[in-house]
């Protein structure tokens, strides 16, 4: 179900990792049903779409002129705003006035838009953002994509789309998220990195422009219980308390993440494997 709403609050939050800031939500919810999705904890069903797009863009414009950010930094040359923190914008684009949003960032002297996606939306190729929209294609081993991200674009389709979006004027990054630790995880990521490397050569990507962000899994107790109730597959690798520790989210939720004593080693293993196979894919940040 998709409902139209009028956004009444326009809080812009600092990010500092993927982007400099998180924009007020153009949409809230997701029409996918990924097993690990934090959005499903807050909105289990449907999508709410803000109708007052120009009010949100006006707020971003007012904010960016006074944003205290030293540039350039690891987020980029421009002041970057995540426009899709609470949805998959590429999947939901047809419900938004997306061209108006993209034109705002394309034409703005300071601001740049960014979003992560698991959906290849070829309609977006009709627009040339002139490097002012960054698409972060989410990637994980295809074996687990099928189970944990049902009905999303395949990993192969996401990789094959990268040169098309680069040529159309988008900036494209890779979003390794969530990284899930289990018995064969490094073997599976080696295969994924090999495929990425072959694709980059076959499709002649501009390798130096395709950077990466890496986010290890955080899971949630309520989502875990809902997954069990709904009999979703894959929960056995998401919920592993023997290697995880509790964490209270900023909103008071009961989360679990990999134990800090182990996570440093996981990060080291991932980074060494990644850099051995695709060293051209600069990791912007990893946590």
Where do the model's predicted regions map?
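Catalytic cores of alpha/beta
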Residues: 184-200
């Amino acid at each position: 179900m998709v409902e139209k709403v009028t956004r009444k609050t326009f809080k812009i939050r600092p990010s500092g990792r993927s982007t400099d800031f998180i924009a007020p939500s153009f949409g809230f919810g997701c029409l996918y049903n990924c097993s690990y999705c934090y959005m499903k904890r807050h909105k289990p069903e449907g999508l709410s779409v803000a109708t007052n797009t120009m009010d949100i863009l006006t707020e971003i414009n007012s904010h960016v002129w006074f944003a205290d950010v030293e540039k350039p930094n690891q987020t980029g040359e421009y002041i970057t705003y995540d426009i899709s923190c609470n949805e998959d914008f590429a999947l939901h684009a047809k419900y938004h006035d997306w061209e108006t949003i993209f034109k705002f960032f394309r034409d703005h002297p300071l601001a740049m838009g960014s979003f992560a996606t698991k959906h290849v939306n070829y309609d977006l190729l009709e627009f040339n953002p002139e490097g002012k929209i960054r698409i972060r294609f989410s990637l994980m081993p295809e074996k687990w994509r099928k189970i944990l991200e049902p009905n999303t674009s395949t990993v192969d389709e996401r990789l094959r789309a990268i040169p098309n979006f680069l040529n159309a004027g988008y900036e494209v990054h890779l979003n390794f998220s969530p990284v899930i630790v289990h018995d064969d995880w490094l073997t599976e990521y080696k295969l994924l990195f090999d495929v990425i490397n072959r694709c980059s050569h076959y499709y002649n990507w501009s390798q130096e422009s395709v950077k990466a962000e890496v986010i290890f899994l955080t899971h949630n107790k309520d989502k875990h219980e809902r997954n069990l109730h709904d009999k979703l597959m894959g929960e056995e690798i998401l919920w592993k308390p023997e290697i995880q520790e509790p964490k209270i989210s900023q909103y008071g939720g009961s989360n679990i993440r990999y134990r800090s004593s182990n996570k440093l080693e996981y990060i080291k293993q991932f980074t060494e494997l990644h850099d051995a196979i695709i060293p051209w894919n600069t990791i912007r940040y990893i946590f």
